[in-house]
A protein has these predicted regions:
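Glycine-rich phosphate-binding loop and adjacent beta-alpha segment
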Residues: 164, 220-293, 326-330
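Glycine-rich beta-strand-centered segment in the early N-terminal region that forms part
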Residues: 21-39, 50-92, 216
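NAD(P)H dinucleotide-binding glycine-rich loop of Rossmann-like/cofactor-binding domains
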Residues: 14, 45, 78, 84-149
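Short, glycine/polar-rich helix-capping loops at beta-to-alpha or helix-loop-helix junctions
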Residues: 93-95, 172-180, 246-251
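Short amphipathic alpha-helix with an adjacent loop that forms part of the alpha/beta core around
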Residues: 197-207
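N-terminal Rossmann-like NAD(P) cofactor-binding module of classical short-chain dehydrogenase/reductase
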Residues: 86, 144, 190, 213-214, ...
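Mid-domain Rossmann-like dinucleotide-binding core that forms the NAD(H)/NADP(H) cofactor-binding site
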Residues: 118-195
């Protein structure tokens, strides 16, 4: 089969089309003939050497796919060959065939294309768990979402608004991106290049602060987030686009305001832990796609052989929404 190899890692130019053996599904897994694969920031980090795959995972890039099941392990009963699914994968998505846990597969929501479905798993597993479970967002609360125009960001905006019933503030890096966030449901979108977002959040909330912050930036954003939270607020850290260290960290406001500072990664969780996220997604979120209350947005699609260009676009941060690789669209 064809797949994308990144050799010893490095800049996007290391990504090359290669030939390799087709994976064999292990117990509890299915083999998917990949039609489309989503491109995500962790793929870029893995390629550059700063996010190695966990033990036992495929070394091939790609954490989400959509396509047709062609084989199942003997113990798999919930899916069969011929079923068309989207799936969260532990790796291996940038390939013509990818093995994935059966419990991490979801049907294509009615009304969405296979290409659109490939853009769902990584974002929605991440967002549902971190906003609803770890962030404990409740109806009537306020949430600040950083990076609202990216895949995680616009998914979180919609989830918080439609399922969470919250007031949503978000940050974005341009007027165009801010407008996109508003179209996705954000009540207020702040251009962080032109506005002091922390000062604006203070004004918008009457200096009360927000109940939840979902952050992918870290670095000097952390203490700004802490100061932007209300009493009993929750800061959920899911990435660090700046740095993982916190300059000028001060624990006192966390203690005074009784804040919860939590964080998570998705890829290193067990199969069972990820399956526990898939179940409520199918019950509570997938019907909202089918009713048109939730949307996905694929900004650009590249052929598998042009994975380099897809990564260059991801690293430029010029995109809005999702980037997808076309593998074997059928």
């Amino acid at each position: 089969m064809r797949y994308i190899d990144y050799g010893d890692g490095g800049p996007p130019g290391v990504l090359k089309l290669a030939e390799g053996p087709r994976p064999v599904p292990k117990a509890g897994e299915v083999l998917i003939e990949v039609a489309y694969a989503g491109v995500n920031r962790p793929d870029v980090l893995q390629r550059s050497g700063s996010y190695p795959p966990p033990p036992g995972a495929s070394p091939v890039l790609g954490l989400e796919v959509a396509g047709r099941i062609v084989e199942t392990a003997p113990d798999v009963t919930e899916w069969k060959a011929g079923d068309v699914v989207c799936a969260l994968t532990p790796g291996g998505g940038y390939a013509e065939y990818c093995a994935a846990p059966a419990a991490h597969c979801l049907p294509i929501p009615r009304g969405l294309s296979v290409k659109e479905a490939a853009s769902l798993p990584e974002n929605w597993f991440t967002v549902y768990d971190n906003v609803m479970t770890r962030g404990r967002l409740k109806a009537g609360e306020t949430i600040l979402i950083h990076g609202g125009s990216g895949g995680i960001g616009y998914s979180a905006i919609q989830l918080a608004k439609v399922l969470g019933g919250a007031t949503v503030y978000t940050t974005a890096g341009s007027a165009e991106k801010a407008e996109f966030c508003r179209r996705m449901g954000a009540d207020v979108a702040l251009n962080y290049r032109e506005q002091d977002w922390a000062a604006e959040v203070a004004k918008l909330t009457g200096r009360r602060g927000v109940d939840v912050v979902l952050d992918m930036v870290a670095g000097d954003y952390v203490m700004k987030n802490v100061r932007s939270l209300a009493l009993e607020g929750r800061l959920v850290q899911i990435a660090f686009l700046k740095e993982n260290r916190i300059p000028d960290f001060d624990a006192l406001p966390i203690m005074i305001k009784r804040l919860t500072f939590t964080g998570s990664t998705l890829r290193r969780r067990t199969v069972e832990q990820k399956a526990a996220i898939a179940r409520p997604l199918r019950v509570h979120v997938w019907p909202l796609f089918e009713s048109g209350q939730l949307r996905t947005f694929v900004y650009r699609t590249f052929p598998l052989a042009e994975a380099r260009a897809a990564h260059e676009l991801m690293e430029s941060s010029q995109h809005i929404g999702k980037i997808v690789l076309e593998v074997k669209p059928g």
